């Protein structure tokens, strides 16, 4: 505890003065209105005083390309009171004062016209190679959890960024940045500011104005005040990035469903019309698209592209495949809601690290407080109550391109069984109505990344796990006799 507090003091943070009485509004956001007079939006996208042609600009409804001089001019009746530039490849991601990406301007809805200037700066190093951190579910609710985020998780983010050594690194907060306490956005912002990289933000179900909203349309007011639009796009190198809001508030207490509104689908259809078929698209959302009610319509829009979907929400890792879409459901920064070191499926508290080279993408899951090589957990025979005669492995980021083998006294054995089962450590920490102490409602979850095998009674075992990219992780163990 003293070391953590020393780190916080060093970084100039003070969790003892949480922003419990208010939240810092950056934008002066106005409530959307269903019917209003159109506003003329005109302006320029420029760099070094020179207009940039063919750059997409949008109000969340209309998508228009700048002309040869970088100018744009359109009438907006969008319900989203922002205009944003779909940042083109080769230009820096500027930051707001709170550390988030700056790519938008608020619109004055009472004015008959708005003049907008987007000034972009070229990157210092080509961004066809770039890296990103995906932070799903930091989900801070109180002072203790803020301290955990700032003193344990954030130093890990910083160290990973240092090791990446990539000037084009950026981050994505993949929703549930806080846990209903929206005033803690300021404390979340302290974490991302400390990383010194720009962060794009995704709205999660716990980031919404549930208590004083009657429809989904106005349920992201506070989020918008801090971070801007809740859906948008941008480009890095050869990759087109999309952020969607797939949390639909029903207007009943905290009730929501996974659903993408027609406004977003119509906007996305127009946005993607300017993207060449066959390109790689990375889409970020909070609720896994696999669980979204109208996902088929989204898959149809994405069908011309090679798509990776990055999501969170479930506090466990899953990989889903739908035609040309690979969805990566990430483990939570907060694990099982800051109750201990792991998520409900046994995945360590952590985040995703993605590296892009041209149109190719590689990734790994980074466990907080562990080396990047920490990719599985071994359990001796007799530990798993359902399989008492087996040794078991939890390989949390496993997908079908991974391989697993083991050596018994130097002899290679390749037979392992993948079984839907719970993780023994999760069972120990989470099972029952009194565990975990901080969140007794958190229960161990059945997962599809548990593996089982049966060694001889007396053996020395080496486990060898290889990921999708040929990286091999080895551990030698001596199981019970």
Could you say what each language-model-derived stretch is?
Residues 137, 175-176, 204-205, 286, ...:
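Active-site glycine-centered loops adjacent to acidic/histidine catalytic or metal-binding residues
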Residues 88-107, 182-277, 294-311, 318-357, ...:
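Extended active-site neighborhood of metal-dependent phosphoesterases/phosphodiesterases
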Residues 33-42, 47-48, 93-186, 457-459:
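N-terminal active-site segment of His-dependent metallophosphoesterases
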Residues 325-409, 444-478:
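Binuclear metal-dependent phosphoesterase catalytic core
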Residues 1-18:
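N-terminal secretory signal peptides and thylakoid transit peptides that target proteins
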Residues 61-76:
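Short, acidic Ser/Thr/Gly-rich low-complexity loop/linker segments typical of extracellular
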Residues 423-452:
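Aromatic sugar-binding surface patches on proteins
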Residues 39-42, 46-61, 404:
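Short, ordered, surface-exposed loop/turn motifs in non-cytosolic proteins
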């Amino acid at each position: 505890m003293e070391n953590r507090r020393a780190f916080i003091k060093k970084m100039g943070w003070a969790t003892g003065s949480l922003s419990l009485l208010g939240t810092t509004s950056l934008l002066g956001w106005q409530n959307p209105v269903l019917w209003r007079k159109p506003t003329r939006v005109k302006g320029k996208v420029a760099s070094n005083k020179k207009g940039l042609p063919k750059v997409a600009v949008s109000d969340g409804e209309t998508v228009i390309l700048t002309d040869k001089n970088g100018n744009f001019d359109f009438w907006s009746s969008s319900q989203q009171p922002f205009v944003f530039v779909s940042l083109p490849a080769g230009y820096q991601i500027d930051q707001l004062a709170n550390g988030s990406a700056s790519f938008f301007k608020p619109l004055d809805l009472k004015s008959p016209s708005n003049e907008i200037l987007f000034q972009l700066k070229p990157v210092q190093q080509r961004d066809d190679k770039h890296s990103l951190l995906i932070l799903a579910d930091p989900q801070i609710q109180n002072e203790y959890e803020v301290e955990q985020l700032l003193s344990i998780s954030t130093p890990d983010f910083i160290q990973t960024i240092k090791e990446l050594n990539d000037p084009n690194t950026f981050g994505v907060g993949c929703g549930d940045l806080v846990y209903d306490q929206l005033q803690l956005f300021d404390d979340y912002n302290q974490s991302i500011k400390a990383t010194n990289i720009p962060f794009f933000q995704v709205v999660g179900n716990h980031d919404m104005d549930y208590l004083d909203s009657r429809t989904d349309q106005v349920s992201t007011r506070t989020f918008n005040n801090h971070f801007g639009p809740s859906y948008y796009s941008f480009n890095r190198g050869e990759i087109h990035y999309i952020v969607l809001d797939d949390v639909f508030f029903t207007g009943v207490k905290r009730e929501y469903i996974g659903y993408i509104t027609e406004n977003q689908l119509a906007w996305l259809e127009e946005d993607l019309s300017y993207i060449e078929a066959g390109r790689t698209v990375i889409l970020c959302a909070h609720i896994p698209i696999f669980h979204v009610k109208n996902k088929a319509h989204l898959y149809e829009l994405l069908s011309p592209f090679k798509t990776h979907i990055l999501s969170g929400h479930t506090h466990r890792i899953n990989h889903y495949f739908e035609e040309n879409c690979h969805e990566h459901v990430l483990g939570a920064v907060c694990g099982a809601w800051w109750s201990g070191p792991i998520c409900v499926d046994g995945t360590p508290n952590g985040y995703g690290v993605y590296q892009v080279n041209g149109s190719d993408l590689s990734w790994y899951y980074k466990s907080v407080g562990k080396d990047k090589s920490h990719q599985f957990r071994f359990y001796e025979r007799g530990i798993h109550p359902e399989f008492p005669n087996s040794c078991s492995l939890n390989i949390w980021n496993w997908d079908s391109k991974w391989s697993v083998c083991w050596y018994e006294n130097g002899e290679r054995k390749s037979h392992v069984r993948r079984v839907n089962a719970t993780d023994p450590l999760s069972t120990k920490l989470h099972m029952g109505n009194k565990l975990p102490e901080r969140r007794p409602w958190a229960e161990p979850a059945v997962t599809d990344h548990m593996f089982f095998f049966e060694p001889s009674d007396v053996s020395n075992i080496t486990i060898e796990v290889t990921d999708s990219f040929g990286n091999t992780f080895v551990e030698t163990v001596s199981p019970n006799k």
